[in-house]
Every structure is written in structure tokens, then in C-alpha cells.
Regions:
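Conserved phosphotransfer microenvironments
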Residues: 34-39, 48-79, 83-89, 196-236
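Active-site-flanking beta-strand signature of metal-NTP-handling nucleotidyl enzymes
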Residues: 154-155, 293, 315-326, 349, ...
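Short regulatory alpha-helical coupling segments
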Residues: 294-315, 334-344
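Conserved helix-loop-beta segment at the catalytic/binding core of cyclic-nucleotide signaling proteins
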Residues: 286, 335-369, 378, 382-390
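Receiver (REC) domain switch/output surface
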Residues: 97, 106-130, 137-138, 243, ...
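Catalytic-core segments of nucleotide cyclases and related cyclic-nucleotide turnover enzymes
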Residues: 366-377, 400-423
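Amphipathic HAMP/coiled-coil signal-transducing linker helices
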Residues: 276-298
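Two-component/phosphorelay signaling modules centered on CheY-like receiver
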Residues: 9-31, 160-183
Length: 423
């Protein structure tokens, strides 16, 4: 598949390998520019992606280029433009949110990372276009969340060597952390949690690392995950790099490994946010873009309808409230998304401002609802982490089932002291 440009390659010395790799991938047109001319080139012809093929010792020129990218984003309604930066000796480039790649790796891998980042740009463009289209039909257009994606990102740290505690600590200063001491634990976390990056620490042999990389390579949804491998597994990285474009070996301290991975983690979390936003737009705002559950006003409207339908048909209906008193924003959002995955297709839910989650079980009596709610609470306790990194988020569950004399207000009043007011 050809890469539709233009693409800007910034370097004071000719970057023939990068240009040739881009041409081999079908990229067109390719604009080469020196650092002194980079800002003017971007202004004249805004690129789809930027490759910093060599470093820039002049911080003023780098700042001018960064400002030019900000201006381009403003003109394009904030559209994301990927910047891939070659870093000498694995040093982090002094360029905000640049996706670093070691200068010594083949240029084909650089193009692979650019292609992965362009998928996020395409998704972002689709979301912005759909928002403009929806705005012509209704005034109730949901806003794209603008918080830092790192605030809701989660990283899997797998390993059982001496570096594992320091990696978890370093990652926990920036993002949510899920620890795994075995490849089975890592695979379980991948299936049950929202993961935006993986760090494979020391303590694993080559076969274990290969097994974990195979799990990632075999599923399309994992292939763009940023993966940092700590340890000397060069041969494995080279063999999996064609199918895992964001796979890289990192050395140095735990803080250095996390610093390298953070721009990739932020980008992956942003991509997940865009997918939730697209689902929200598909549902014309009925789905909350943060949680993936129903928007609050829609939930209470649907609850009223479900109560009326159940009363007319004589069908069972139950409601549960999951309260998470110790949860911060990140934990609360992840819990809501996890509940969304655990629910049956006939059920619906929303999250309130206090992070509590209301879930309606249609055609379900109190006994059956108790079984389902207990299973959800058990998964939350086993899977979720508290803010201090300890497993087991405290989850209080209250249940009620519809009685013949019930209204929506009386049903909800039995599970909460002060029922939320529908918007």
C-alpha cells in the first residue's frame, strides 16, 4: 500500500537510506530539507509525516520547527502529525512527543513506525471529519476529550529479574502499571486490560520472550503496541520487527527505558481514545467517549423505557451499583471499560461523576443478577489496581430488582441514598 504524502525528511546531511526506504514503500512526494529550512518547507507544504533523519545541535532551530508543527496542527483543527526522530546512541531527542528510533536500525523499520503512526493520523482525521458532519445535523456534538492520554494509559511490565521493581516504579510515576511475573500472567493481562505499552524486563529466557512476542504478533490489535525489551535479545527483535513495528531493545536505567517509551504510549492511548470517540459518533453521542458506556442522559432515558417495558410485559429487571470509593480517575475509567466488556449484550450501564457504575440487567431476577454482579465485582477486585499499585480495588455492590409497585425513582432509591438526577 502506497504512503500518500507529502513526507518531510529533515537532515543537514543527505539521508539516502531513509529516502530510499520511503520510496520503496511507495511514499510520494518526499521533500528533503535542511534544519535551517525545515520550518519554511513545512509552511509551504504541510506534510503527512516528518522524519528527523539526524539530530540538531541548534536548539533554536529545533524550537522553530516545533512551532511550525504547532501552527500546522492549528490550521488542520489539531490533526496529529507523526514525527519520527533518529536518536544517536539511543539518546532521547530533544523534541516534544517525537517518536524516537535508534539511528543504527535499518531505515525500513523507521518506515514501519511511520506507517503505524499514520494509522493514528488517519483515524484522527476520520473523527474530526465525522464531528464536522454531525455538527451540520445537530447541536449536541460530543467533544473529543482533551486530557493527556497518559492520564488514562496502562503499561504492562513483565519480568522477574532484578530490574522489575525499578521498572514498575519508574513507569508508575507516569502511567498505570500492570505487573506480570510470568508469560501466562502477561497474556492474561493483554486479554483483560487496556494495555498501551509493554516492557519486557530481565529474568526471562529467550524462549519465554519469543512466546510473548509471538502472542503479540499473532493478533492484529496488538501489532502497533509499543514494546521495549530490556536485555540482550537482539536476534529475536530483528526477527519480530517486520510484524511489530514499535518493538525496540532499550538499555540504560529504568527511567531511561520509560522515557523512551512514553511518546509511543501516549500515541497508543490516543489511538484508543479516537476509537471510542468514533463509536460515540456512530451512536450520535449516545456512548460516552471516555468510558465506552452509555452517556448519562441516554442511560436514564433507556432505564425509564426498560422499566415501562418490563412492567407492561411482566418481565424481570434488576439494577446494580458498583461503587469504587478509593479509585482515582484512571482507575475509575478503566473499571468502567472493564464492566463494559463483562456485561451481556442485553444489559446497559453508565458511570456517574463519583465514579460509581450503574448497570441494568434486563429480563433478570434478583438471584440471577446477584450472580452476574458478583462475577463482575470479583473480576474488578482481581484485575484492577489501586492508586498505590496494590491489587484489589475495593468494590461495594448494591442490587435491587423491579417490583410491581416500583417506579424508576423508587427502584434506584433502593441502591443509592441520593439517586442521581437525569440530565
Amino acid at each position: 500500500m502506497a504512503l500518500q504524502g507529502p513526507f518531510a525528511v529533515i537532515a543537514d546531511q543527505p539521508a539516502r537510506d531513509v529516502v530510499e526506504a520511503l520510496r520503496a514503500a511507495g511514499a510520494y512526494p518526499i521533500i528533503e530539507a535542511r534544519w535551517a529550512d525545515a520550518a519554511a518547507v513545512l509552511h509551504a507544504r504541510p506534510p503527512q509525516g516528518v522524519i528527523l533523519a539526524d539530530g540538531c545541535a541548534d536548539h533554536a532551530r529545533a524550537a522553530v520547527l516545533e512551532k511550525a508543527l504547532e501552527v500546522q496542527a492549528e490550521h488542520e483543527a489539531g490533526l496529529f502529525t507523526p514525527v519520527i526522530a533518529r536518536a544517536r546512541d539511543d539518546l532521547i531527542p530533544r523534541f516534544a512527543d517525537a517518536l524516537s528510533i535508534a539511528a543504527k536500525v535499518p531505515a525500513e523499520r523507521l518506515v514501519g513506525r511511520l506507517t503505524a503512526a499514520l494509522r493514528v493520523r488517519t483515524l484522527h482525521a476520520t473523527v474530526l471529519r465525522r464531528m464536522r458532519t454531525l455538527a451540520t445535523r445537530t447541536n449536541a456534538v460530543p467533544d473529543l476529550p482533551n486530557a493527556d492520554p497518559l492520564d488514562e494509559a496502562g503499561v504492562l511490565v513483565a519480568g522477574r529479574g532484578r530490574s522489575h521493581p525499578s521498572l514498575c516504579t519508574a513507569a508508575g510515576e507516569h502511567v498505570g502499571v500492570i505487573g506480570a511475573l510470568t508469560v501466562e500472567g502477561a497474556a492474561h493481562a493483554l486479554k483483560s486490560r487496556d494495555i498501551d505499552g509493554i516492557i519486557i524486563g530481565d529474568g526471562f529466557g529467550a524462549r519465554v520472550v519469543e512466546a510473548l512476542l509471538t502472542v503479540l504478533a499473532e493478533e492484529a490489535r496488538f501489532r502497533d503496541l509499543p514494546v521495549a525489551v530490556v536485555g540482550n535479545h537482539t536476534a529475536l527483535i530483528e526477527s519480530f520487527a517486520p510484524v511489530l513495528p514499535n518493538l525496540e531493545r532499550v538499555g540504560g536505567s529504568a527511567a531511561h527505558a520509560i522515557e523512551y517509551l512514553l511518546p509511543y504510549i501516549r500515541l497508543h492511548a490516543f489511538g484508543r481514545r479516537l476509537k471510542r470517540m468514533l463509536a460515540c459518533l456512530d451512536a450520535k453521542g449516545a456512548i460516552d467517549p471516555d468510558t465506552g458506556l452509555l452517556a448519562n442522559a441516554v442511560f436514564w432515558r433507556d432505564l425509564n423505557r426498560a422499566v415501562d417495558t418490563a412492567e407492561k410485559r411482566g418481565a424481570a429487571l434488576s439494577i446494580a451499583r458498583f461503587s469504587l470509593p478509593a479509585a482515582d480517575r484512571r482507575t475509575g475509567l478503566e473499571a468502567a471499560r472493564l464492566v463494559g466488556r463483562l456485561m451481556r449484550h442485553v444489559d446497559f450501564a453508565c458511570q456517574e461523576a463519583d465514579k460509581s457504575i450503574f448497570t441494568v440487567f434486563t429480563e433478570t431476577d434478583l438471584r440471577a443478577a446477584h450472580v452476574v454482579a458478583r462475577r463482575i465485582a470479583s473480576v474488578l477486585k482481581k484485575v484492577m489496581l489501586t492508586t498505590d499499585g496494590k491489587a484489589g480495588v475495593e468494590t461495594a455492590v448494591t442490587l435491587a430488582t423491579l417490583k410491581p409497585s416500583d417506579s424508576t425513582e423508587s427502584l434506584v432509591a433502593r441502591i443509592v441514598e441520593e439517586p442521581p438526577k437525569p440530565a
